[in-house]
Amino acid sequence: MDLPGLIHDFLLVFLGLGLILGGLGVVLLTNPIYSAFSLGLVLVCISLFYILSNSHFVAAAQLLIYVGAINVLIIFAVMFMNGSEYYKDFNLWTVGSGVTSLVCTSIFVSLITIIPDTSWYGIIWTTKTNQIIEQDLISNGQQIGIHLSTDFFLPFEFISIILLVALIGAIAVARQ
């Protein structure tokens, strides 16, 4: 969006706080319905980030696929779970939780220290002027497809494998 700098910065901070609070809600809330709604807040904030960066197609896809389908499916599955069985042996803090929080905190701290020191100017997508002219003739949807199948093929495959493992884990948890 073409917004003045102060409004754009305010929206970035507001959406960032929404992401942080929603992420904490997903992790810390004990009721799975509330966690699913917090996940919906996180996904909506991500789509609003895409709108702020003028990626309207990706924002619409984010809303339709993740909020409209995946999050509704999660809420639907959680509603069919037996809630009284879920809370019987619920311990707030275990050894695995401590190890997981230690690993996540160390990854977070390392990212916070590495990202500001990285030279982002060395990352150049197009080096020739004819590539820039050719990219202007291709629509946004085609550019997304080209980048997903060439530049971002490996990360795209990793994300699809992670989503597949998460889906298999959700099915395994639902069957127990």
UniProtKB/Swiss-Prot annotation:
What Pfam family is a match for this entry?
Oxidored_q3
> Which principal EC class is assigned to this enzyme?
translocase
Identification of the protein by name: NAD(P)H-quinone oxidoreductase subunit 6, chloroplastic
This molecule's function is given as:
NDH shuttles electrons from NAD(P)H:plastoquinone, via FMN and iron-sulfur (Fe-S) centers, to quinones in the photosynthetic chain and possibly in a chloroplast respiratory chain. The immediate electron acceptor for the enzyme in this species is believed to be plastoquinone. Couples the redox reaction to proton translocation, and thus conserves the redox energy in a proton gradient.
The Enzyme Commission number assigned here is: 7.1.1.-
Which residue ranges traverse the bilayer? 10-30, 32-52, 61-81, 95-115, 152-172
Gene that produces this protein: ndhG
Annotated Gene Ontology MF terms? NADH dehydrogenase (ubiquinone) activity; quinone binding
- Gene source species: Manihot esculenta (Cassava)
